[in-house]
C-alpha cells in the first residue's frame, strides 16, 4: 500500500470530529466470516446444495415452513466462535474517543457491538438479538445458542433472528437514524462495501461533508467522488494506522 495514502487517512481522521463509518461484508472477512455472496460464502454453499439462498433467507420460508426455517438459521447462521478484528476495534475506539458519531453497517454478525461500539445502525438487523414472532419476547444470541432455543419460553411460538429477511422492509427508524448520521458527518469512511446493494448503498449519496474515504479491495461506483480511495487489504491498512499511532 502507498505510504502517502496512509498518511492522508491519518490526517483526515485526526482532523475530523464527526466521523461516520459505513461498513460492509469485507470488514468481517478477517474474523472468519466470508462475504455472503463470495466464493465459499453462504450463498455459494447453499447453491451447491441445490437450494435457493434467497428463499431460505426469506419471510416466505418462515411462513411456509417454520421448522425448516428454524433449522436453517441454527445450522447456517449461528456461529459461536467469531470475534471482532482490528477494524471493528478501531471503529469502536474512535467512537469512545468521541471522534465518531457511530457506525452504519450492512452486516448482521453483531461484531461491531461485540467490539464495543454503541452507536450502531444495523440496516439489515443483527444475529445478536432474537424475538418471538407471536409475543415479541426477546432473547440474546448467547442464550439461544446455550439453550438450543427454538421456541419461545413464554408462549411456545417460534423465535427468529432480528434480521431483515428477503420480502421484508428495512426498519424505517434505523434508516432515518442512519441518514441523519450521514447528513451530520464531516467525514464518511466506507469500509469493505462494494456500494451496490440498494437501498443501503444509496445512503452514501446523502453525504455532504468534507471527506469521503473508501477502503475496499475492489472499485465501487462512488470512487470518483471520494477524497481518498484505497484498494487494498483492509486489515493491513487499519493495522498500519493503529501501529503508527501507538
UniProtKB/Swiss-Prot annotation:
Q: Which PROSITE patterns match?
A: SIRTUIN
Q: What is its main location?
A: cytoplasm
Q: Name one GO cellular component term.
A: cytoplasm
Q: How is the cofactor bound?
A: Binds 1 zinc ion per subunit.
Q: What is its EC number?
A: 2.3.1.286
Where does the chain bind Zn(2+)? Answer: 132, 135, 152, 155
Any idea where this protein resides? Cytoplasm
Q: What are the binding positions for NAD(+) in this chain?
A: 25, 36-37, 106, 108-109, 124, 193-194, 216, 233
Record's keyword annotation contains Zinc: yes
Q: Which cofactor does it need?
A: Zn(2+)
What sequence ranges are listed for the domain Deacetylase sirtuin-type? Answer: 1-246
Instruction: Print the keywords alphabetically.
Output: Cytoplasm, Metal-binding, NAD, Transferase, Zinc
The reply on keyword NAD is yes
What would you give as a GO molecular function for this chain, any one? Answer: histone deacetylase activity, NAD-dependent
The residues the record assigns to binding nicotinamide are 36, 108-109
Record-linked NCBIfam families: PRK00481.1-1 (NF001752), PRK00481.1-3 (NF001753)
Q: What does this protein do?
A: NAD-dependent protein deacetylase which modulates the activities of several enzymes which are inactive in their acetylated form.
Protein name as catalogued: NAD-dependent protein deacetylase
| Species of origin | Staphylococcus epidermidis (strain ATCC 12228 / FDA PCI 1200)
Amino acid at each position: 500500500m502507498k505510504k502517502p495514502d496512509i498518511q492522508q487517512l491519518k490526517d483526515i481522521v485526526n482532523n475530523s470530529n464527526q466521523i461516520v463509518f459505513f461498513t460492509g461484508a469485507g470488514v468481517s472477512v478477517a474474523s472468519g466470516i466470508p462475504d455472503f455472496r463470495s466464493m465459499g460464502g453462504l450463498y455459494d454453499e447453499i447453491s451447491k446444495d441445490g437450494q435457493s439462498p434467497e428463499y431460505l433467507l426469506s419471510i416466505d420460508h418462515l411462513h411456509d415452513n417454520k421448522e425448516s426455517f428454524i433449522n436453517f438459521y441454527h445450522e447456517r447462521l449461528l456461529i459461536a466462535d467469531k470475534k471482532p478484528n482490528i477494524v471493528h476495534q478501531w471503529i469502536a475506539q474512535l467512537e469512545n474517543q468521541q471522534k465518531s458519531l457511530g457506525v452504519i453497517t450492512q452486516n448482521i454478525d453483531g461484531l461491531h457491538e461485540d467490539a464495543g461500539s454503541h452507536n450502531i445502525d444495523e440496516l439489515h438487523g443483527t444475529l445478536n438479538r432474537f424475538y418471538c414472532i407471536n409475543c415479541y419476547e426477546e432473547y440474546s444470541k448467547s442464550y439461544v445458542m446455550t439453550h438450543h432455543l427454538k421456541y419461545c419460553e413464554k408462549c411456545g411460538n417460534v423465535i427468529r433472528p432480528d434480521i431483515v429477511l428477503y420480502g421484508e422492509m428495512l426498519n424505517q427508524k434505523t434508516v432515518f437514524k442512519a441518514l441523519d448520521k450521514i447528513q451530520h458527518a464531516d467525514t464518511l469512511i466506507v469500509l469493505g462495501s462494494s456500494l451496490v446493494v440498494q437501498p443501503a448503498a444509496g445512503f452514501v449519496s446523502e453525504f455532504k461533508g468534507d471527506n469521503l474515504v473508501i477502503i475496499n479491495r475492489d472499485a465501487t461506483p462512488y470512487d470518483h467522488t471520494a477524497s481518498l480511495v484505497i484498494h487494498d487489504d483492509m486489515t493491513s491498512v487499519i493495522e498500519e494506522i493503529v501501529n503508527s499511532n501507538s
